[in-house]
Amino acid sequence: MQQAPAALAVALALTATACGAAGERAADRPAGTPSGTVRSPAALPSAALPPALTPGQARAALITAADLGEAWEPTRGAATWRDEVLKTASEGTARDGCRRLLDALYTEDLFGGSAAAAPRATAALDDTDTGAQLHYRITSYRAADLDRTLAWLATLPDTCGHVGTRAAGTAREVRVTALTPPETGDARVGLRVTVRDTAATEDGTLTVDVIAVRIGDDALSLTHGTLGTPSGTATRTATETGTARLTEARRQGRAQV
């Protein structure tokens, strides 16, 4: 009976030694160096993901038709050019990066299709005066992965600046240029994508402005498209108002933790 405390002390000492050795091995690795097998984001355990906004918090951060003006209202359905132009242009594009972009515009899914990166909230609005349509999404994911998508988008004016497509007997010209977004959030990128029917006798050019902004581990993305030129005022208002609301939703979310 007198030996039990001593045995317990030895066991505790051995445990402390093992923990200390593990800590030293971890300290020996450079910061940011992964240990073990590197897995895809979808394979990582949920504990590795940052805390996401609740659905209610994400919905509260959405923009509304009232933010953009009297001509705007909740959408009544997908615009006709979504299938007639975007989908067929994507099907006729051989260049991988360009097709990926057109697919992302068609599905409104800029940040990937994994369940972990699924949008937390979405909104779709129509401009009844011009026929423009604005789709808006809020996504929660790892900041590094969000930045990876932003970096890819930023390369597209160079890698997919001008490409021809042909599908369903129609030849189209796709152009991707940089668009300067408002100075909001932690990181941001903007693009203007135009798709033109090369045989059209009248102006039938589809123009889609794309904005993506990261704020911490959350991001907002919007596409603003029309057969013509999207309103720069509406795009800017949606971006700035949305960023302010998302920032406030994040602040309130942290305060409730």
PLM-predicted stretches and their roles:
Residues 1-10:
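N-terminal export and membrane-targeting signals
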Residues 52-54, 134-141, 225-232:
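Second-shell loop/turn segments in exported
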Residues 59-65, 69, 147-154, 236-239, ...:
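Extracytoplasmic/secreted envelope proteins and their assembly/folding machinery
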Residues 66-72, 76, 157-164, 242, ...:
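Sec/Tat-exported extracytoplasmic proteins
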Residues 75-202:
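A small/polar (G/S/T-enriched), proline-flanked helix-loop surface module common
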Residues 175-240:
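A short, solvent-exposed beta-edge/loop patch
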